[in-house]
Design a protein with these regions (language model features):
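An alpha-helical repeat/solenoid feature that recognizes helix-turn-helix modules
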Residues: 1-38, 53-87, 118-145, 163-190, ...
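Long, well-ordered core segments of solenoidal/helical folds
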Residues: 1-7, 35-58, 93-117, 145-166, ...
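Non-catalytic propeptide/linker segments at domain boundaries
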Residues: 85-89, 93-95
């Protein structure tokens, strides 16, 4: 089978690459290797387009084109090691070829020319998936130029993203902490923020 994971349970729910990628990361991260887990892995690989279609991933199989968020989360599910590893020595940005994971990484690298992944095909910037890609590239030991640009962008935009309207976005801080670990950046001096105390002070009993 090629079972994927849907965003919500129930009749009519269709599997998507984002939900499947994060679910696979969680299941494989705790050592699960059942038939269903292997089917989700197959589903993720089938979401990746060939180089002639950019090498990115589609959100759902019937979509007409690739999706940046889906691309980042499929690669995160397939290749990221969690908790995030300390910074590895990274090879150059990858090129599209015969390996699907590398092709997907190549697509993401091509989308990180400014250091920030966009919400393509929608508007806006996606700092969460930028951070996810930093963590994944570090696990894969590739993408040196992309990672360097991305961590600078994350530091520059950390406060605006993680402290929007004066409220702590704990999910954003969590992604920034993982990106900091993956690049040997100080979590206590990250873009003018102490990520550790920002997160702990936001916790409620």
């Amino acid at each position: 089978g090629t079972t994927g994971v849907a965003y919500y349970p129930g009749a009519g729910a269709l599997p998507d690459a984002n939900s499947s990628g994060l679910a696979y990361a969680a299941m494989s991260g705790v050592g699960m290797n059942s038939a269903i887990v292997r089917q989700v892995r197959t589903y993720l690989f089938r979401s990746i387009t060939p180089c002639t279609e950019s090498g990115g991933a589609k959100f759902q199989s019937g979509d007409g084109g690739v999706n940046n968020s889906a691309s980042a989360q499929v690669l995160f599910g397939l290749k990221a090691l969690t908790p995030a590893e300390p910074a590895n020595r990274l090879a150059k940005d990858p090129s599209c070829g015969k390996n699907k994971s590398t092709n997907l990484a190549s697509y993401l690298s091509s989308q990180l020319t400014t250091g920030t992944l966009s919400n393509f095909p929608y508007d806006g910037n996606d700092y969460g998936n930028t951070a996810a890609t930093v963590v994944t590239f570090n696990s894969m030991k590739i993408g040196k130029s992309s990672v360097n640009k991305s961590i600078l962008s994350l530091k520059k935009n950390a406060k605006a993203w993680a402290l929007k309207n004066g409220q702590v976005n704990a999910g954003a801080v969590g992604w920034l902490l993982m990106a900091a670990e993956a690049t040997d950046s100080s979590p206590k001096k990250f873009g003018g923020m102490n990520l550790v105390t920002t997160l702990t002070k936001s916790m409620k009993k």
